[in-house]
From Swiss-Prot:
Organism: Vibrio vulnificus (strain YJ016)
Gene Ontology MF: a single term: ATP binding
Record flagged with keyword Transmembrane helix: no
Keyword Transmembrane helix (UniProt): no
Alphabetized InterPro entries for the sequence: aa-tRNA-synth_I_CS, Gln-tRNA-synth, Gln/Glu-tRNA_Ligase, Gln_tRNA_ligase_bac, Glu/Gln-tRNA-synth, Glu/Gln-tRNA-synth_Ib_cat-dom, Glu/Gln-tRNA-synth_Ib_codon-bd, Glu_tRNA_lig_a-bdl
Record-given protein name: Glutamine--tRNA ligase
GO biological process, one term: glutamyl-tRNA aminoacylation
EC code(s) of this entry: 6.1.1.18
Any GO CC annotation of this UniProt entry: cytosol
Record motif 'HIGH' region, residues: 34-44
Pfam families given in the database record: tRNA-synt_1c, tRNA-synt_1c_C, tRNA-synt_1c_C2
Family: Belongs to the class-I aminoacyl-tRNA synthetase family.
Renumbered ranges of motif 'KMSKS' region: 268-272
Lineage of origin: Bacteria, Pseudomonadati, Pseudomonadota, Gammaproteobacteria, Vibrionales
Gene: glnS
Amino acid sequence: MSEADARPSNFIRQIIDKDLADGKHTSVHTRFPPEPNGYLHIGHAKSICLNFGIAQDYQGKCNLRFDDTNPEKEDIEYVESIKNDVSWLGFEWDDEICYSSNYFDKLYEYAVELINKGLAYVDELSPEQIREYRGTLTAPGKPSPYRDRSAEENLALFEKMRDGGFEEGKACLRAKIDMASSFMVMRDPVLYRVRFASHHQTGDKWCIYPMYDFTHCISDALEGITHSICTLEFMDNRRLYDWVLDNITIDCRPHQYEFSRLNLEYTVMSKRKLNQLVTEKLVNGWDDPRMPTISGLRRRGFTPASIREFCKRIGVTKQENMIEFSSLESCIRDDLNENAPRAMAVLDPVKLVIENFPAGEVENLTVANHPNKPEMGEREVPFSREIWIEREDFREEANKKYKRLVLGSEVRLRGAYVIKAERVEKDDEGNITTIFCTYDSETLGVNPADGRKVRGVIHWVSADKGVPAEIRLYDRLFTVPNPAAADDFASTINPESLTVMNGFVEPSLVEAEAEKGYQFERMGYFCADSKDSSKEHLVFNRTVGLRDTWAKIEAK
C-alpha cells in the first residue's frame, strides 16, 4: 500500500488531490485560526487534527493564527493555553505564530481601497437601527440613509473613526453590497467598528477593529493559504469571503471549504454554555476533568494519541450528526489497555487479616507491569499479614456466579497467594469490619498442588505499606445525550458526575507522574491529578472504566 493509499480519505482531501493533479496548486498550505477568548475543546481538536494532519500528509504547511480582532474578550492567557494544547496534541505550526493583528495596517489599506471603489461606507445608524434595517429572512432590508455618501466623505469619516473621533456604537464601516440579498450576511455587513480597548498585541495603537469576515479572508490571502477549512456554520459567510477578495487588489486567492462540526453526546460545546458552567461554579474551572476542553481531557488522563485517533475515526463530512460519547471513551480505553502499566488500588477498603502469615513480616512480591508486554518490566509489591480488599469483593454467602471471596471458600490474590475466608468481625450495626483468612503458602505463582479449583482473582493492597489516596471517579457531566437542546441545560447536569472516595494504593504509585495513565487492576484507568496530587496527598482521577457501563444503562 502506498503512502497516499494509507491516508484517511474525505471530501476535502479529494479536493486537494484534484487541485494538485490539475496544477491549481503545487503545494498545500492550511491554517488553524482560533480566537484567543477561551480554552480549546474537543471540537477544536477535530479542526486541529484536520488542518495540521493535511499539512503533514501532503508535506505542506499549517499556520497557527490567532484571530485576535476583539480585544475586549481576548487575553494572552488564552494565547498561551491554545499554544500548549496544539503542541500537546502533537502538532507543530509552520514558522512563527501568526496574529490577525499583524495585518491591521494592511486591513486598513484594503478598507480604504473598498471606500475608493464605492464599495464601503461609514454608517452612523445605531447598532439597533442596523439590525432593524437589515430586514428578516422573509423580508428584504432597506438602505441606510448614509449609504450613498461620496468616497471622499467616507474616507474622511473613516479616518475620523481611526483617530477616535466617534464614540463606540456611533459609527461603523459597512460593505456596500445588496440590502435585498437573500443571504443576510450580504446585506451590507459591518467591516469595522469602534472599540476603545487595549489589545494584547498592539496595545492602544488602534481604536477601530476589523470584523471576522473582513479579516479572515484577507489573512488567508496574505499568508498564502491554499485551502481555508472551517465548519458548516460559516457556509453562508463564504459569499462574503469571496466578495471581499474579488474586490481588493491581492495576489493570492484562497478558497473556503466547510465540514461538519463535532457534536458529542452528554456534553456541550458552546463557549457561552461552557463559560456558564465555570462562572456559576457548576464545575471546578476550565480544566475540570468533566469538561470537554482539551485541558480538562488532559487532566482526566486522555492522551494525545487517543484524541487524534478519535478524530480519525469520526472522519470529516458535511453531514451533521451526534457522536456517541462511548466512541471517545473507546479510543482512550484502547490506548491505555495497550500502553498503561498495571497497578493495584483499593477504592472501598475492608481489612483482611491472614492469620497464618507471620506477624510483622513483609514479603516483596515481583509483579509484571503489563501482562502482555514483558518489555515494560516488573515492580515489587509488598505483601503482609493485613491487607485491604474491595468491600464488594467479599460476601458471606453467594451463588456460583460470584467469582470472588466467599466465607468458607478460596480466591487468589492478584500476583500473590490463594486465601480462604474463615470468619468475619462486625460492628454494632452489622457491618463487616475485618475478614479473617488463611493462606496457602505453596500457591505463589502456581495452582494448588492437590488440583482444587479456585473461584477467581481479586486485587489487594498491603495495609502496612499501602498509601492513602483520594480517588475521584468522573462520569458524564450530563444525564441526557443532548443537553444543549434542553430549556435549561444546567438542569440536566449529572449529580453523580463526580464521586470522591478514600482508598489505598500500592506504594509504587507515590512516584506516579501527573497525567500518566495506569490501569488499576479490575477498577479502570486512572492518572495522578496534575493540580492536586502530591507525594503527601495522592489524588487519582478515573479516566475511563474498563468497560462501557453506560451501554448497559441505555439498553435497559
